[in-house]
Amino acid sequence: MPDAVKVGFVPFSAAARGTLVVFCDDTLKFGSVTGKALGAAASTVKRAVAASQFKGKSGSALDLLAPEGLKVGRLIVIGTGKAAALKDNDIVKLGGAVAGKLSTGDSAVTVIAELPGGAMRPEQAAAVASGIRLRAYKFDRYKTKKKDDDADAANANVSIAVADVAAAKKAFAPDSHVVDGVILARELVNEPPNVLYPEEFAKRAAQLRKLGVQVEILDVKAMTRLKMGALLGVSQGSAHPGRTVIMRWNGGKRGAQPVAFVGKGVCFDTGGISIKPSASMEDMKGDMGGAACVVGLMHALAARKAKINVIGAIGLVENMPDGNAQRPGDIVTSMSGQTIEIINTDAEGRLVLADVLWYVAQKHKPKFMVDLATLTGAIMVALGTDHAGLFSNNDELAERLTAAGLSTGERVWRMPLGPEYDKQIDSQFADMKNTGSRNGGSITAAQFLQRFVDNTPWAHLDIAGTAMGAPKSDINHSWGSGYGVRLLNALVAEHYEAKK
């Protein structure tokens, strides 16, 4: 996976070189180590900060030519706001602010990991490192000519000066693997659809075998034998046959019940016969954001040797118009035996998930299942791009997901489920139809999925607004966000993973 910067840790005593980055709070105070590093130039720097009307707000940045007496060429001051009020994810954002100020010429950068109240804890220094890597990522491999501003932070070597190098490295080791998982998810979402189609996506998921993940790929023949009629109906119009990929990480006790994560992987969605408008159809390469998250999560958990058994399952298809494509009015039989009338071929993601959810629930009997899908435009109307929609049949699981969202910044908002919505997907000809009215569209989609989880505790995350194309954030300027990897890693680590 590409990395625009290299991040390491050095002791406070190490000499700064190239560009020096320091932190100050909203009172414009520096810590003692920072003051010592600035030396005789400290008073000059303080005057320059005051003269610039810099307020020290969290994430704000001031770029200065280093004054005489400093053995660096450039000085960057990053504001922390009220340092005592900073939470873990706020520290990650500070790292993002650091990366945002790096430029092509910054081959060597030293960041002093100190807040005005004292040295950052090892976990905080690790969070800064994570933020730097997340924000520095960019997807530009298909550009043959790059502008100067396309190369910001490229090839920078960032040294984070800390009180305890060994402790910082230990804290960053698992975090670094999670960042790798986020970057992998972003890479998958950003890839063009002529490169990343179902068979290729399955091959990339299979690379997790290098980390000790067991990977099983179900082809059309295997899915036909399993009677996955809902998923196969979606893929039948494409020249690229569908795949289902089952990934298993056995990091817990042998035979212990696994947890499961399921992702929608529509590698390109034209809408099928119910074809979408051409405007922005190119964005539908990202309709596999849920599957990308699951692969990124499995990478993170396996790489950091998570002490838990985990199933990751993704259904991979293309939804294309063709003489062999599924039609409105068709009735398909899902793996569960339930029949589905196709009203709109553009409501295809729920059909893919229906069979994969049922397969996982029946074969692996997980403790819980969380599915992720860029499922409905309706969730964007309701929640915009700052929260994913959360639907669940289990209050404890929903509460834990909500807490993990708050701690990581990958926020969720719980939406309702209830039998009163079922009538919208009742069919005259089959057990159900694949879409209801426009009203409550994200709810009826989740209501549909609930019919395929049996009695398993389950949560559905509608990530249509958060997985791709959202406004740039403190830690992501890429089109694909990698949303969900940090959220679900935190859920597992906090509540389900065996403690050492």
Swiss-Prot record:
It catalyses: Release of an N-terminal amino acid, Xaa-|-Yaa-, in which Xaa is preferably Leu, but may be other amino acids including Pro although not Arg or Lys, and Yaa may be Pro. Amino acid amides and methyl esters are also readily hydrolyzed, but rates on arylamides are exceedingly low; Release of an N-terminal amino acid, preferentially leucine, but not glutamic or aspartic acids. This is Probable cytosol aminopeptidase. It comes from Rhodopseudomonas palustris (strain BisB5). It comes from the Bacteria. Its EC number is 3.4.11.1, 3.4.11.10. Mn(2+) 2 binds at residues 264, 269, 287, 348. Keywords: Aminopeptidase, Cytoplasm, Hydrolase, Manganese, Metal-binding, Protease. Belongs to the peptidase M17 family. Binds 2 manganese ions per subunit. The gene is pepA. GO terms for cellular component: cytoplasm.
